[in-house]
């Protein structure tokens, strides 16, 4: 793992993954994502039953998506596969099973302390 990154993202769910992708699209190349779980999208993995529908619009509430990740209705499995593919295709660094304990500002950078240190 590198010591200095342009951006560090805490949380490997859909929002964290999207933040990493958007950062790279904007030209920020040294990106790392920290996730305390064994894989991305822990909430979906843990609380959604197998084959459960994952809808783009929650209970009919239309959401206008802006950005570079295409999201569509699917199942738990197809949604997890989609995010696997997005991570692989974009090539940002991901540290799973890495819980961020604190972040401290130090001059013009931030220090990130994890349970692993």
Language-model region placement:
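N-terminal Rossmann-like FAD-binding beta1-loop-alpha1 element of flavoenzymes
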Residues: 3-33
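Short alpha-helix immediately C-terminal to the canonical SAM-binding loop
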Residues: 41
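Residues in the short beta-alpha loop(s) of Rossmann-like NAD(P)-binding domains
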Residues: 36-37
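N-terminal Rossmann-like dinucleotide/flavin-binding domain of flavoprotein oxidoreductases
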Residues: 45-116
């Amino acid at each position: 793992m590198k010591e200095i990154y342009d951006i560090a993202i805490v949380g490997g769910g859909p929002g964290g993954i999207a933040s990493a992708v958007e950062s790279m699209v904007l030209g920020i190349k040294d990106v790392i994502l920290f996730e305390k779980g064994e894989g991305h999208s822990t909430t979906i993995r843990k609380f959604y039953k197998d084959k459960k529908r994952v809808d783009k619009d929650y209970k009919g509430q239309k959401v206008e998506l802006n950005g570079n990740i295409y999201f569509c209705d699917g199942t738990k499995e197809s949604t997890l596969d989609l995010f696997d593919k997005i991570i692989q295709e974009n090539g940002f660094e991901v540290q799973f099973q890495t819980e961020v304990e604190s972040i401290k500002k130090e001059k013009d950078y931030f220090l990130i302390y994890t349970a692993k240190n």
